[in-house]
Amino acid sequence: MKTHKNHLRLLILLLLVLLACAGYMTVGVHFENQKLFAYAMRIRTPKLIAMLITAFSIGSASIVFQSIINNTIVTPCLLGMDQLYSLIHTAVFFVAGSGSFLAVNANAAFAVDLAIMGAVATVIYSYLFRKTNHNVLYVLLIGTVLTSFFSSIQTTLTRVMDPNEYDTLLTDLVASFSNVNSAILVLSVAVLVLVAFALRKELALLDVLTLGKDQAINLGVDYDRCIRRLLLGVTLYIATATAMVGPLAFLGLIIANLSRQFLSTYRHSQLITGSVLFGMAVLIGGQLLMERVFVYSVPVSVFITVGGGVYFLYLLLTQRKA
């Protein structure tokens, strides 16, 4: 009975997302003018696809990460990918300037971001995980230290940077769906699909892994290998989303916990689906609000940061009372 209720809730969420998509694609469009209509569709379609891809990558990665760490108020941003993204772009502007190839070419910037973050994720969260005897808490601590390290270097560079370059850099460090093109979208989808395919066996074992290490091993699961591969997959998913649109630190916290509270189940297939759908609704709704109400004066990341901060405090207070 509970499974049927959750399926119904997921269906309602899906309908809300479809309505949000339809609203985003049609609000303010001049249907009577063929050229204006075609122009609006050409501008909005890549943005919508980017929001759907971002919601999928962050939503699924957040649920998996929380299950690995066994804590529902942590987010994958603790792995340091957001700060590494900021450091990469700050270094490019500091060394080569705002007129350099990497600063003006979105495709090249995406490729470099993804390559560096993917390499860092592979070296740190695969190699060091083995070196720490497969202790996820050590890995979480390493991620927190790296976040502070990347942030300190980035802050130092911005303090000695030319003010004009810094002003241009600020717009590049804010999450935006405006500079996404078809080449970036295709490459992002390819990366996400390849990672999901490579981890299909581990993803199927998530329900067992959350029982605990001893129980999972007793059931025949290679626990350490599964956790290591899933952690690497989470990092690559977050790296892909961050390289595509920029850092969205609180989004994972919001949508993962909304999914857990809305569905009240331990089935990861349903939790991940709910998290992805909530992510789509939040991003599309926020983008629509930013474009139509605030007329591009406030980026969507501000809404997510403010809402995520308030929601985080709510989670802390409610869990403390519980």
Set out the residue ranges of the language-model regions.
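Alpha-helical transmembrane segments in inner-membrane proteins
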Residues: 1-322
